[in-house]
Amino acid sequence: MEKNGTVHTGTVRQSLGLSLAALGVVYGDIGTSPLYAMRECFHGTHPHPATPDNVLGVLSLIVWALILIVSLKYLVFVLRADNRGEGGILALTALLNPWGDENRPPRKVLVFLGLFGAALLYGDGTLTPAISVLSAIEGLKIATPLFHPYIVPITVVILILLFLIQHRGTARVGALFGPVMVLWFTVLALLGIRGIMMAPEVLGALNPLHAVLFFVRDGWSGFQVLGAVFLVVTGGEALYADMGHFGRLPIRLAWFCCVLPALLLNYFGQGALLLSDPSEATEPFYHLAPPWALYPLVLLATLATIIASQAVISGVFSLTRQAIQLRLSPRMRIVQTSSEEIGQIYIPAVNWALMLATITLVAGFGSSSGLAAAYGVAVATTMVITALLVRFVMLERWHWHPLAVAGLTVVFLTVDLAFFGANILKVGAGGWIPLAAGLAVFTVMITWRRGRELVTTHLLAQATPLPSFLEELAAKPPQRVPGTAVFMSGRLFPAPPTLIHHLEHNKVLHEQVVILTVLTEDIPRVSASERIELKRLGQGFYRLIVRYGFMQSPNVPVILRECEPLGLVTDPETTTFYLGRETLIPTEKVSGMPHWREKLFAFMSRNSLQATAFYNLPPDRVVELGQQVEI
């Protein structure tokens, strides 16, 4: 089976094993939506009376949202748009756009859309753990009102513990995620069947005519309820983002064989319950269960929401690494938490920021209904952006007929924009929070990338071409000392400023000089056979270019060891690494970007992870040479 290819093939057993694993990672978010989605339609920000017509109409909307958005749009079409097996909106943006063309309209618009869509996922990353765990714990107040004052404190404690153990990784307990979610979806289905038996006529909601009549009858108020209906598909983007871990086939198998049937049965069961007793709209999910099963159900729901939250947190870690490697974010400390699974990482700065934001949301809103008012805006926006980007993939990568592309795009955007419009109505009720978070992250991304461009432009203007430098060196050879010097350079062609400064000040050079450039390609992974490009320049100089994918982390000492068969032999004890360290001076004289963004870039640059740690260099073998740069 090809682990990172566009199509995962293999035995039925392997596919089923990956499908089981996908249940524990991919479907946690969408799988826990029954806890609150139906309730919000009839007892939320824009509540509707639970009349039979309204119940059948809303249920029909839920059914067809799952079919059109998740089953058709994502499972059939969007999952085809992989970047060498990897999914997610940043991978999709990288697939569409070689960064060198980003200034060509409409390419620049696509880049900005992709970056904004990725930034919005950070807002979703704070809301999903908050609303999921809180909605699970709220089941306790149904058992007894005595628990009501403790719902928020219990939720906060669980979330704090969840974030505190992130540094340990999920290698040991991750194997349990799949079986727990299988049990969860089984319980969803059984509860749904129990509810359907109360009012079998609820199955009539399969007819989309009920959804149409609901809009005809309710008009504007019917449109408003779409914001609550959308909660059933908020995990749709996760299917695409996690494609690289499992492949298309296992994700599709898990959806059509397990997740979709369980969700439909449970939503039908909740609908049947409301047909039988409209007063149960306050908590239709938990009221499906018999009284004796309430406490076990709360425990299982809590485990399922913790697993869903873990998947979202891990997804934010992965997204951050992609952003760092694509030079959209300052360098941060990335910890590998598993020696076997390269995708299992931990980023402390992101973890603590998520924890603070999530706990603040739980304490501030105090209920999952309050959070539901803020939930969905970011995801709805991202889904619209994904639909637009996939349109260009259909045309430019798949070369589909323009009429077919236009037809599919119209269908997808009609549905997505309807949900987007309904969710925009939530902005005043808290929906501004994920939008503000996304805008802040987007500002960081574009400021960091633009700032690095300005620094590069400044340094290139003062740079000496490498051939000219080598000619001058041959004419006036300096004294050479034993050992190897590795000069890190972010640019391919000129001589590194650190090399020139070192030679000017110290008047000596090592016997071996390696000019090393680490490049990040617009693909998830670069194979070992394509990673290293080594060229002898003469006079003991080597030009070493190393390529990584945006899902990989660079390790320079390992690269140097891998260069030995190519003729570059280095001794770690006599190798010195020379790094440039720019001191940025924001100034209004250089009109690169607004002054406030220059100050923001300078602040981020000062506080980013040192190159020594990012490239895994031995600290006692590193020399840093400073340079002032006006931006």
UniProtKB/Swiss-Prot annotation:
This is Probable potassium transport system protein Kup 1. Pfam families: K_trans, K_trans_C. Keywords: Cell inner membrane, Cell membrane, Ion transport, Membrane, Potassium, Potassium transport, Symport, Transmembrane, Transmembrane helix, Transport. Transport of potassium into the cell. Likely operates as a K(+):H(+) symporter. InterPro entries: K+_transporter (IPR003855), K_trans_C (IPR053952), K_trans_N (IPR053951), Kup (IPR023051). The keyword Cytoplasm does not apply. The chain crosses the membrane at residues 16-36, 58-78, 109-129, 145-165, 173-193, 219-239, 255-275, 288-308, 345-365, 370-390, 402-422, 427-447. It comes from Geobacter sulfurreducens (strain ATCC 51573 / DSM 12127 / PCA). HAMAP family: Kup. The gene is kup1. It is a multi-pass membrane protein. It is found in: Cell inner membrane. Belongs to the HAK/KUP transporter (TC 2.A.72) family. GO terms for biological process: potassium ion transport. It catalyses: K(+)(in) + H(+)(in) = K(+)(out) + H(+)(out). One of its GO terms (molecular function) is symporter activity.
